[in-house]
């Protein structure tokens, strides 16, 4: 598919939408992001990114996408997205570039590679928004590199799983310049609710704390199910009973029914969760923190990888506990 290239004036002649606003705060209230004045780039069209990007296209934004496996972007292309052959090419055609990829090494490559990275193609005043769960130190590094080029960078990882992405109900943890985060709200609001957490890297710190909480919550959920099963309870009725009490949680809402149906399709991959928990543990070591629940959850999720189950969803933690106890949890409806 041919690229739809636009001709831009030299940055020395005219600055971008964001740079104009950073220099003239009086225009902030009137110069709001709209589909007519802001071009979007999107890098990473997996389980989460595909739905998130789709909301922007549906809202009328011109979007250029890049994904290493182009077939994973086909749905977006069918919706009207342009396709580029590199992150650099995406940035050349965009005012705001979003990324949501797998690992910190992927983030570094797609954003900071001197030849093919998005930052190398971004014009003065452009904005990078990394929505990958990654290392806080890398977010700080990207922000410094962007600032050196008179650009902006926001770390904005998300929580809410595939259903949150599909329904535009994600929780977004944003770190970076607060004014820039506020300017991006017309875009963030299409994907969920943005929460400003502080300076660059603080969005990543918040997401890592979120993952620590999720790990313990998921472990409690599957342990409770195994105990209820062994005690002879109807696990479906058990889940219904606890969901409205003090044990109710987002994990039950999102994954309880899937677990009962033994539906382990990924809303969020075990492989990626292991990566997240590994980053958490590294940060804990750096901070001098001992979080035994986090360490235990990491070991159990690593056991799923060892059994070739890394491409299942995080609710597959049930399988690790079933093997440990030689049981198989079944709903009466199964």
Curated annotation (Swiss-Prot):
Q: Where is the active site?
A: 207
Keyword Mitochondrion assigned to the entry: answer is: yes
GO biological process assignments:
valine catabolic process
Main localization is: mitochondrion
Localization per Swiss-Prot or TrEMBL = Mitochondrion
Keywords per UniProt: Acetylation, Branched-chain amino acid catabolism, Mitochondrion, NAD, Oxidoreductase, Transit peptide
* Swiss-Prot/TrEMBL catalytic activity: 3-hydroxy-2-methylpropanoate + NAD(+) = 2-methyl-3-oxopropanoate + NADH + H(+)
The kind of enzyme this is, by top-level EC class, is: oxidoreductase
The record's annotation in Pfam families points to: NAD_binding_11, NAD_binding_2
Transit peptide location on this chain = 1-23
EC no. given is 1.1.1.31
Q: In which pathway does it act?
A: Amino-acid degradation; L-valine degradation
State any single GO MF term: NADP binding
Q: Sorted alphabetically, which InterPro entries does this protein's record hold?
A: 6-PGluconate_DH-like_C_sf, 6PGD_dom2, 6PGDH_NADP-bd, HIBADH-like_NADP-bd, HIBADH-related, NAD(P)-bd_dom_sf
Q: Where does NAD(+) bind?
A: 38-67, 133, 275
> Which residues are recorded with the post-translational modification N-acetylalanine?
24
Which family does the record claim for this protein?
Belongs to the HIBADH-related family. 3-hydroxyisobutyrate dehydrogenase subfamily.
Put simply, this protein is called Probable 3-hydroxyisobutyrate dehydrogenase-like 1, mitochondrial
- Organism, by scientific name, is Arabidopsis thaliana
- Lineage of producing organism: Eukaryota, Viridiplantae, Streptophyta, Embryophyta, Tracheophyta
């Amino acid at each position: 598919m041919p690229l739809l290239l636009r001709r831009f004036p030299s940055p020395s002649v005219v600055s971008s939408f964001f740079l104009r606003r950073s220099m003239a705060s009086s225009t902030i209230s009137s110069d709001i992001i709209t589909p007519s004045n802001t071009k979007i780039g999107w890098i990473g069209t997996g389980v989460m990114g595909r739905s998130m990007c789709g909301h922007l296209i549906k809202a009328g934004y011109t979007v250029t996408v890049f994904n290493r496996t182009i077939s994973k972007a086909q749905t977006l292309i069918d919706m009207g997205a342009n396709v580029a052959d590199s992150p650099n090419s995406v940035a050349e055609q965009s005012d705001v570039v979003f990324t949501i990829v797998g690992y910190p090494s992927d983030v570094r490559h797609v954003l900071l590679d001197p030849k093919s990275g998005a930052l190398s193609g971004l014009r003065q005043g452009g904005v990078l928004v990394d929505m990958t769960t990654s290392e806080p130190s890398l977010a700080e590094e990207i922000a410094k590199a962007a600032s050196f080029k008179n650009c902006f960078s926001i770390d904005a990882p998300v929580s809410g799983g595939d259903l949150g992405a599909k329904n535009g109900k994600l929780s977004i943890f944003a770190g970076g310049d607060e004014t820039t985060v506020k300017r991006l709200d017309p875009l963030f609001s299409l994907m969920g609710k943005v929460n400003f957490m502080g300076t660059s890297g603080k969005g990543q710190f918040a997401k890592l704390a979120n993952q620590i909480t999720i790990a313990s919550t998921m472990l409690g959920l599957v342990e409770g199910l195994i105990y209820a099963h062994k005690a002879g309870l109807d696990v479906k009725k058990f889940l219904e009973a606890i969901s409205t009490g003090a044990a109710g949680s987002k994990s039950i809402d999102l994954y309880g029914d899937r677990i009962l149906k033994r539906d382990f399709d990924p809303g969020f991959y075990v492989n990626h969760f292991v990566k997240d928990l590994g980053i958490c543990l590294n940060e804990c070591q750096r901070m001098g923190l001992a979080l035994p629940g986090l360490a235990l959850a990491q070991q159990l999720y690593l056991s799923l990888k060892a059994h070739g189950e890394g491409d299942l969803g995080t609710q597959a933690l049930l399988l690790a506990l079933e093997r440990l106890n030689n049981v198989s949890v079944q709903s009466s409806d199964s």
